[in-house]
């Protein structure tokens, strides 16, 4: 039985990660932002923990809670889309802060505090990023603030792989596909079950050679 930590588990991809890992008999710790959103996680059999990723003190306190854990798999899934559209326009300060703090700053705060628990088990760390964050695959201007945030998240994950890979932690950035969630919309390509099954399959097979890679849910390696 593995110990699995899902950050941002109240709905969508995060909730499906919880559902599938619990169904396999794993011990799952799942974070959510508000007390009300923990009920569904508890019913699934996970251990819910309230965590506001934008609260630096809360992140440090959470790290203390994890200090005695051995985490086999940690998935940082929390994220926001921000303004949509094709136009390259100046982002407002509130939009910029909301997207960059949630998608970049929060994971950068979390990764170092989770590292000891991952190192202890030679575990695996994944961030749910997006193909839209790839510089080499960029072909349009849609959602440019979101793109920038995911490019920064990719850089953070790649940097973490250089720090923690030599200590036995496999670090991966995922493109989950275009998924039918609140963020992806109803016309997206795949359902959340298919996306998470693919990412879980990759995590199960991941080894030292997977460290620092950017991988599609279907196993395709993506360029940064």
Give the positions of each predicted feature.
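C-terminal helical subdomain
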Residues: 166, 173-176, 185-224
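Structural signature of the Rossmann-like NAD(P)-dependent dehydrogenase/reductase core
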Residues: 6-7, 76-77, 124-130, 170-175
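Conserved glycine-rich Rossmann-like NAD(P)H-binding loop of the short-chain dehydrogenase/reductase
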Residues: 21-39
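Rossmann-fold cofactor-recognition segment
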Residues: 43-57
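N-terminal Rossmann NAD(P)H-binding glycine-rich loop of SDR-like oxidoreductase domains
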Residues: 10-22
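Catalytic loop of short-chain dehydrogenase/reductase
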Residues: 80, 84-100, 108-109, 119-165
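Conserved Rossmann-fold cofactor-binding substructure of NAD(P)-dependent oxidoreductases
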Residues: 53-69
């Amino acid at each position: 039985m593995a110990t699995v930590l899902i950050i941002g588990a109240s709905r969508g991809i995060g909730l499906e990660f919880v559902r599938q890992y619990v169904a396999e008999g794993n011990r799952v710790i799942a974070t959510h932002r508000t007390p009300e959103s923990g009920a569904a996680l508890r019913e699934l059999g996970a251990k819910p923990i309230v965590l506001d990723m934008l609260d630096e003190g809360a992140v440090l306190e959470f790290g203390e809670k994890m200090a005695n854990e051995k985490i086999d798999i940690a998935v940082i899934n929390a994220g926001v889309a921000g303004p949509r559209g094709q136009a390259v326009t100046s982002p407002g300060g509130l939009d910029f802060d909301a997207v960059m703090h949630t998608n970049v700053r929060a994971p950068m705060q979390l990764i170092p505090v989770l590292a000891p628990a991952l190192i202890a088990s030679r575990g695996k760390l994944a961030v749910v990023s997006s193909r839209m964050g790839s510089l080499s695959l960029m072909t349009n201007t849609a959602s440019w603030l979101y793109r920038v945030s995911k490019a920064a998240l990719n850089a953070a994950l790649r940097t973490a792989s250089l720090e923690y890979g030599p200590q036995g932690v496999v670090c991966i950035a995922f493109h989950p596909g275009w998924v039918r969630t609140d963020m992806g919309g109803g016309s997206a390509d795949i359902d959340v079950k298919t996306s998470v099954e693919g990412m879980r399959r990759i995590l199960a097979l991941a080894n030292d050679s997977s460290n620092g890679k950017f991988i599609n849910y279907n196993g395709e390696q993506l360029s940064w």
